[in-house]
Amino acid sequence: MEKKRNISMAVIRRLPKYYRYLAELMDNDVDRISSKELSEKIGFTASQIRQDLNNFGDFGQQGYGYNVKDLYNEIRSILGLDENYNIAIIGAGNIGQAIANYTNFDKMGFNLKGIFDVNPKLLGLKIRDVEIRDIDQLESFLQEEKIHIGVICVTKSNAQDVCNTLIKNGVKGIWNFAPIDLNGADNVVIENVHLSESLLTLTYLLNGFN
């Protein structure tokens, strides 16, 4: 399926939730589901779900709903998960180690190829058989390995330099957990993840119930 280029970011950010929920339905041997049933489970309106999916094709049938497996596979393809992606993690602190240890990424086709840090106490240790290397080796590693996604888990002051090194050596996707929005080239996709934003959303909602 050819992806459309004018899809709003709001729609794109809803797709992983559809994908995750459809996977749960498949695990529970559910064969089909209506947009109304999806709405009740996911929290989006049925109309919103239909509009989102119609951006990519006509997947549902009147009176039948959606075939769960077919829709799951379509969204998997839309999300680019028919491909495998090599990733490198820069920063082996708590966040970096948590990401490295998350085995579900393997199941989705994300292959951990390298982990880098500056802390001499961490160098040489292994996380799931991947050795933590000195960050001074990052550039030569990137020149030898085809890395699709760099995961940045370093300090705010070092994040942009790491990002620049990744981009200079051909990495096209940056998943950034440093508390700063990074700048990149036009042909590079950067996803800045600020963990505090989710927490502050929670405190806002909690405050509304007090």
Swiss-Prot record:
Cite the Gene3D superfamilies for this sequence. Answer: NAD(P)-binding Rossmann-like Domain, Winged helix-like DNA-binding domain superfamily/Winged helix DNA-binding domain
Residue intervals annotated as DNA-binding region are 17-56
Q: Which GO terms describe its biological process?
A: negative regulation of DNA-templated transcription; response to redox state
Sorted alphabetically, which keywords does the UniProt record give? Answer: Cytoplasm, DNA-binding, NAD, Repressor, Transcription, Transcription regulation
Q: Where along the chain is NAD(+) bound?
A: 91-96
Localization, per the record, is: Cytoplasm
The record's listing under InterPro entries reads: CoA-bd, NAD(P)-bd_dom_sf, Rex_DNA-bd_C_dom, Tscrpt_rep_Rex, WH-like_DNA-bd_sf, WH_DNA-bd_sf
Q: How does it assemble?
A: Homodimer.
| Protein name listed in UniProt | Redox-sensing transcriptional repressor Rex
This protein's species is Clostridium novyi (strain NT)
The organism that produces this protein has a lineage beginning with:
Bacteria, Bacillati, Bacillota, Clostridia, Eubacteriales
